[in-house]
Protein backbone atom coordinates (compact mmCIF):
# COMPACT_ATOMS: atom_id res chain seq x y z
CA UNK A 1 0.00 0.00 0.00
CA UNK A 2 1.34 3.44 -0.90
CA UNK A 3 4.74 4.59 -2.09
CA UNK A 4 6.49 2.62 0.68
CA UNK A 5 4.84 -0.60 -0.52
CA UNK A 6 3.56 -1.57 2.91
CA UNK A 7 1.90 -4.99 2.87
CA UNK A 8 -1.64 -5.10 4.22
CA UNK A 9 -4.32 -7.72 3.72
CA UNK A 10 -6.88 -5.46 2.04
CA UNK A 11 -8.18 -8.12 -0.37
CA UNK A 12 -8.87 -11.73 0.48
CA UNK A 13 -9.20 -13.32 -2.92
CA UNK A 14 -9.92 -17.00 -3.46
CA UNK A 15 -7.46 -17.48 -6.35
CA UNK A 16 -5.99 -15.71 -9.38
CA UNK A 17 -7.33 -16.64 -12.82
CA UNK A 18 -5.34 -15.55 -15.89
CA UNK A 19 -6.87 -15.62 -19.38
CA UNK A 20 -4.68 -14.59 -22.34
CA UNK A 21 -6.62 -12.82 -25.07
CA UNK A 22 -3.78 -12.12 -27.53
CA UNK A 23 -0.93 -14.20 -28.92
CA UNK A 24 2.60 -13.56 -27.65
CA UNK A 25 5.88 -15.45 -27.29
CA UNK A 26 7.04 -17.22 -24.15
CA UNK A 27 9.43 -14.43 -23.13
CA UNK A 28 6.87 -11.62 -23.45
CA UNK A 29 6.80 -10.83 -19.71
CA UNK A 30 5.44 -14.18 -18.54
CA UNK A 31 3.75 -14.70 -15.21
CA UNK A 32 6.23 -16.15 -12.74
CA UNK A 33 5.21 -18.37 -9.81
CA UNK A 34 7.42 -20.02 -7.21
CA UNK A 35 6.43 -23.67 -6.93
CA UNK A 36 5.20 -24.58 -3.44
CA UNK A 37 5.44 -20.98 -2.23
CA UNK A 38 1.83 -20.99 -1.05
CA UNK A 39 2.77 -23.45 1.70
CA UNK A 40 5.54 -21.22 3.01
CA UNK A 41 3.38 -18.09 2.83
CA UNK A 42 0.58 -19.89 4.67
CA UNK A 43 2.98 -20.98 7.41
CA UNK A 44 4.30 -17.44 7.95
CA UNK A 45 0.85 -15.85 7.71
CA UNK A 46 -0.74 -18.31 10.17
CA UNK A 47 2.05 -17.69 12.66
CA UNK A 48 1.59 -13.92 12.40
CA UNK A 49 -2.14 -13.47 11.93
CA UNK A 50 -3.16 -15.89 14.70
CA UNK A 51 -2.18 -13.12 17.15
CA UNK A 52 -4.53 -10.58 15.55
CA UNK A 53 -8.32 -10.34 15.43
CA UNK A 54 -9.35 -11.19 11.83
CA UNK A 55 -11.42 -7.99 11.69
CA UNK A 56 -8.15 -6.03 12.12
CA UNK A 57 -6.16 -7.82 9.41
CA UNK A 58 -6.94 -5.21 6.75
CA UNK A 59 -5.08 -2.52 8.76
CA UNK A 60 -2.16 -4.63 9.97
CA UNK A 61 1.30 -4.02 8.46
CA UNK A 62 2.80 -7.44 7.76
CA UNK A 63 5.59 -6.21 5.46
CA UNK A 64 8.40 -7.75 7.55
CA UNK A 65 6.68 -11.14 7.72
CA UNK A 66 6.02 -11.04 3.96
CA UNK A 67 9.68 -10.26 3.19
CA UNK A 68 10.91 -13.03 5.49
CA UNK A 69 8.61 -15.53 3.76
CA UNK A 70 9.63 -14.23 0.33
CA UNK A 71 13.33 -14.61 1.12
CA UNK A 72 12.81 -18.22 2.17
CA UNK A 73 10.82 -18.85 -1.01
CA UNK A 74 13.56 -17.40 -3.21
CA UNK A 75 16.07 -19.67 -1.46
CA UNK A 76 14.03 -22.89 -1.56
CA UNK A 77 11.35 -22.84 -4.27
CA UNK A 78 11.66 -23.40 -8.00
CA UNK A 79 10.83 -20.36 -10.16
CA UNK A 80 8.35 -21.31 -12.91
CA UNK A 81 7.35 -19.17 -15.90
CA UNK A 82 3.73 -19.63 -16.97
CA UNK A 83 2.79 -19.20 -20.62
CA UNK A 84 -0.64 -19.73 -22.13
CA UNK A 85 -2.30 -18.86 -25.41
CA UNK A 86 -5.83 -17.67 -26.23
CA UNK A 87 -8.22 -20.49 -25.40
CA UNK A 88 -6.12 -21.55 -22.41
CA UNK A 89 -6.08 -20.20 -18.87
CA UNK A 90 -4.33 -20.72 -15.57
CA UNK A 91 -5.22 -20.55 -11.88
CA UNK A 92 -2.74 -19.52 -9.21
CA UNK A 93 -3.18 -20.29 -5.51
CA UNK A 94 -4.16 -17.17 -3.56
CA UNK A 95 -1.01 -17.31 -1.40
CA UNK A 96 1.50 -18.24 -4.09
CA UNK A 97 4.34 -15.80 -4.57
CA UNK A 98 3.97 -14.50 -8.11
CA UNK A 99 5.07 -11.68 -10.36
CA UNK A 100 5.76 -10.79 -13.97
CA UNK A 101 9.17 -11.28 -15.60
CA UNK A 102 10.68 -8.43 -17.64
CA UNK A 103 10.03 -8.30 -21.36
CA UNK A 104 12.84 -10.13 -23.14
CA UNK A 105 14.30 -8.21 -26.08
CA UNK A 106 13.55 -11.17 -28.37
CA UNK A 107 9.91 -11.41 -27.29
CA UNK A 108 7.12 -10.90 -29.81
CA UNK A 109 3.42 -10.26 -29.58
CA UNK A 110 0.48 -9.82 -31.90
CA UNK A 111 -0.52 -6.35 -33.05
CA UNK A 112 -2.66 -5.88 -29.93
CA UNK A 113 0.31 -6.47 -27.61
CA UNK A 114 0.45 -8.83 -24.65
CA UNK A 115 -3.01 -8.83 -23.08
CA UNK A 116 -4.02 -11.12 -20.22
CA UNK A 117 -7.24 -10.64 -18.28
CA UNK A 118 -6.87 -11.39 -14.57
CA UNK A 119 -9.66 -12.15 -12.13
CA UNK A 120 -9.17 -12.24 -8.36
CA UNK A 121 -12.59 -13.15 -6.96
CA UNK A 122 -13.21 -12.34 -3.32
CA UNK A 123 -13.35 -15.22 -0.90
CA UNK A 124 -16.84 -14.69 0.43
CA UNK A 125 -16.24 -16.24 3.86
CA UNK A 126 -15.17 -15.20 7.32
CA UNK A 127 -11.74 -13.49 7.15
CA UNK A 128 -10.05 -16.35 9.04
CA UNK A 129 -11.17 -18.80 6.33
CA UNK A 130 -8.75 -17.13 3.92
CA UNK A 131 -5.96 -18.37 6.15
CA UNK A 132 -7.24 -21.84 7.00
CA UNK A 133 -8.79 -23.11 3.74
CA UNK A 134 -6.63 -25.15 1.35
Residue ranges and their predicted role:
Residues 8-25, 86, 118-121:
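Short, conserved beta-strand element in jelly-roll/cupin
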Residues 6-9, 17, 31, 41, ...:
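Generic detector of leucine side chains in alpha-helical contexts
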Residues 8, 78-81, 108:
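Short, solvent-exposed segments of well-ordered alpha helices
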Residues 12-18, 28, 79-81, 97, ...:
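Extracellular structured ligand-interaction cores
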Residues 43-46, 86, 90-91, 95-134:
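Non-heme Fe(II)/2-oxoglutarate
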Residues 20, 36, 94-96:
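Short, well-ordered beta-to-alpha junction loops that form the rim of enzyme active sites
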Residues 24-91:
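Double-stranded beta-helix
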Residues 1-4:
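Short acidic (Asp/Glu) patches
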